[in-house]
Amino acid sequence: MNWDQVEGNWKQLKGKAKQKWGKFTDDELDVLSGKKDELVGKLQEKYGMAKDKAEQEAELWREAC
């Protein structure tokens, strides 16, 4: 699944994101809307990840979807 597909199916996928990253609130997940850059930024903010680590986490999650 590519990022365009993630965005298009975000309502179905945000539950998986919530399971993976439990610190995200439902409102934060709604705002992310499946956008990679938004997700990476939120991972950096909530989990204190470096940008490259957050990008890697986002990609691994996308590939598992």
What do these predicted regions represent?
Residues 1-65:
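Intrinsically disordered, low-complexity, hydrophilic segments
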